[in-house]
Amino acid sequence: MSNSAMSVVILAAGKGTRMYSDLPKVLHTLAGKPMVQHVIDAANDLGACAVHLVYGHGGDLLRQTLHEDNLNWVLQAEQLGTGHAMQQAAPFFNDDEDILMLYGDVPLISVETLQRLRAAKPQGGIGLLTVKLDDPTGYGRITRENGQVTGIVEHKDASEAQRQIQEINTGILIAGGADLKRWLAKLTNNNAQGEYYITDIIAMAHQEGHQIVAVHPQRLSEVEGVNNRLQLARLERVYQAEQAEKLLLAGVMLRDPARFDLRGTLQHGRDVEIDTNVILEGNVVLGDRVKIGAGCVIKNSTIGDDCEISPYSVVEDAQLQAACTIGPFARLRPGAELLEGAHVGNFVEMKKARLGKGSKAGHLTYLGDAEIGDNVNIGAGTITCNYDGANKHKTIIGDDVFVGSDTQLVAPVTVGNGVTIAAGTTVTRNIADNELVLSRVPQVHKQGWQRPVKKK
């Protein structure tokens, strides 16, 4: 077992031709974040001293997307094989550290497997991650003598006998910095592909008398790479199935685990119920006894105890205290805050607005840049007119206010406590406590009125 410090190299220079996309392959998302970010996160969780990212195609987009402080960007201008990629990073290796080699398009590698690989690496030798496949066609085969790993033969260079070997190379390995630099300097491209294979260092290490220890991953999906969108979609479902299983075992009721997506992290209380086709993105917190209806999307939000979110509601960057009810078809945009027992009904939109304790906005309403007190009733069709074409302005509504249907509050405006606003009113001035306000035009009756007749 090695006790050395460790750095990680992530190979991410491939074009991803089979993705048929202008986006670099490793930036295609799995569970809401780029594939390569999953690998970077694993490296950081392992406590890597540095992460060397070998890039080529789409370097500008990679730099715009990835903002890790400890990333060292290494350019591979020509893609001449995995060994060539590692040669570009080699000048940054310290002799006394271990180097772990990972891939930006193998997103589900687990920290636990990598910890076992690191622990298994012999002093002066190599730790190698391998798997056995029923059909190993196309993969490099692991050769052994008396049970000991002696080398890796790529499929195109393998003999018929070697092609019968089922144990294959995943490409993930760990070796000492000084040894790795020495072996990389000896690589040649005398092979069927005309490339520099990192796998050739296995035979070099064996010839020098160093031990190579093979470790198997916990699950095959951990080492599955992505070369096309079909493979990416399959890994997405594998990942989501794993997350759903963990949540079910932790006490979350998923009505259909196959129709649930977690694209971030979820902290949850007890007796949480989640219906079908729900998507959770970013960092989501659900309190005890929260119920989420079918088709909801919740992103970067905290939902308090006993809240119920009815179907097809969207909640983003919002905060809900206990016992709030939302939807169906409600939209809470960034900055929405509901205090205890508040209700937002169907086709109500909130942004940068706070709804007080026990207050209700039941139907067809827009509340933006607003502070609304406790026990307020917002009638159907109410709009806070917060934008004058250049700037946003605030609406403040006190406690115990009744706002009638089809009311427009033209900000900036303040409504005092206990105010009653009649239906159809346009509020343009501040209102003192306990006033009744109405601004309707006189109702006109025209007897004997005849509707226009359509011309034929």
Swiss-Prot record:
Residues 251-456 are annotated as: N-acetyltransferase. Homotrimer. Binds 1 Mg(2+) ion per subunit. This is Bifunctional protein GlmU. The lineage of its organism: Bacteria, Pseudomonadati, Pseudomonadota, Gammaproteobacteria, Enterobacterales. PANTHER family: BIFUNCTIONAL PROTEIN GLMU (PTHR43584:SF3), NUCLEOTIDYL TRANSFERASE (PTHR43584). The active site is at H363 (proton acceptor). Its cofactor is Mg(2+). It catalyses: alpha-D-glucosamine 1-phosphate + acetyl-CoA = N-acetyl-alpha-D-glucosamine 1-phosphate + CoA + H(+); N-acetyl-alpha-D-glucosamine 1-phosphate + UTP + H(+) = UDP-N-acetyl-alpha-D-glucosamine + diphosphate. Coiled coil: none annotated. The keyword Zinc does not apply. It is found in: Cytoplasm. Residues 230-250 are annotated as: Linker. Its EC number is 2.7.7.23, 2.3.1.157. Mg(2+) binds at D105, N227. It comes from Klebsiella pneumoniae subsp. pneumoniae (strain ATCC 700721 / MGH 78578).
